[in-house]
């Protein structure tokens, strides 16, 4: 390592976040920031990439990067194998947190709330627009299970291709979407000298309360 970790830092001076810029509810601001990220972030950064944190039945946290695939007034939607590690964790503890980080904009959004499965119709609608290889992979991969090697996975894919050689694959019951219903959304804008702007929205009795947090 050529540079000390203690010396690795950058100052954030691109923008600020004032209450006057922020609407009374968080979804409009998220849409605005997400649109900015789509326009500004460059490959390999994916604007809809997020870290999803879950907690298992023993209270141990787990996190991984996923892609956001849906957003409406209800919440934030992602898709996965229901039998995967994250699926089992959400079964045991249906609360999760998401973090979006857009480095070019010096922005971060943190979201916390309860997670519930979307309808089978919603899962199928998204499944059908995925590339064929991804649809077959949802059937082939025993996600999060221990396998002997890459060859085993490739064999499972070949078997799945043969199974659906004469028909289009349909959405498996073990695969589908989750929607995080937000109870808290924090917008973070990097500022100079680590005096960042943090606007936090909390859902209280069905209404969003906006407040500023110290950096």
From Swiss-Prot:
GO molecular function annotations of the record: FMN binding; pyridoxamine phosphate oxidase activity
Coiled coil feature spans: none
Positions with a binding annotation for FMN: 64-69, 79-80, 86, 108, 143-144, 188, 198
Cofactor: record remark: Binds 1 FMN per subunit.
Pathway stated in the Swiss-Prot or TrEMBL entry: Cofactor metabolism; pyridoxal 5'-phosphate salvage; pyridoxal 5'-phosphate from pyridoxamine 5'-phosphate: step 1/1; Cofactor metabolism; pyridoxal 5'-phosphate salvage; pyridoxal 5'-phosphate from pyridoxine 5'-phosphate: step 1/1
Function: Catalyzes the oxidation of either pyridoxine 5'-phosphate (PNP) or pyridoxamine 5'-phosphate (PMP) into pyridoxal 5'-phosphate (PLP).
HAMAP family: PdxH (MF_01629)
NCBIfam families membership: pdxH, PRK05679.1
Family statement: Belongs to the pyridoxamine 5'-phosphate oxidase family.
Subunit structure of this chain's protein: Homodimer.
Protein name in the entry: Pyridoxine/pyridoxamine 5'-phosphate oxidase
Organism: Pseudomonas putida (strain ATCC 700007 / DSM 6899 / JCM 31910 / BCRC 17059 / LMG 24140 / F1)
Gene: pdxH
């Amino acid at each position: 390592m050529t540079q000390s970790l203690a010396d690795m830092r950058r100052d954030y001076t691109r923008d600020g976040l004032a209450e006057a810029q922020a609407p009374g509810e968080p979804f409009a601001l998220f849409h605005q920031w997400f649109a900015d990220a789509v326009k500004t972030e460059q490959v390999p950064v994916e604007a809809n990439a997020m870290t999803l944190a879950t907690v298992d039945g023993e209270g141990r946290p787990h996190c991984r990067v996923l892609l956001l695939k849906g957003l409406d007034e209800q919440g934030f939607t992602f898709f996965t194998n229901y039998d995967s590690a994250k699926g089992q964790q959400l079964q045991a503890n249906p609360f999760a947190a998401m973090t979006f980080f857009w480095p070019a904009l010096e922005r971060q959004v943190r979201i916390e709330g309860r997670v519930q499965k979307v309808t089978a119709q919603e899962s199928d609608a998204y499944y059908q627009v995925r590339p064929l290889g991804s649809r077959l992979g949802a059937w082939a991969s025993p996600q999060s299970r221990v396998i002997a090697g890459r060859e085993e996975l490739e064999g499972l894919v070949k078997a799945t291709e043969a199974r659906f050689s004469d028909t289009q694959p349909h959405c498996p019951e073990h695969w589908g979407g989750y929607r995080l219903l937000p109870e808290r959304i924090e917008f973070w804008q990097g500022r100079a000298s680590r005096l960042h702007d943090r606007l936090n929205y909390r859902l209280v009795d069905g209404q969003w309360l906006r407040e500023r947090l110290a950096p």
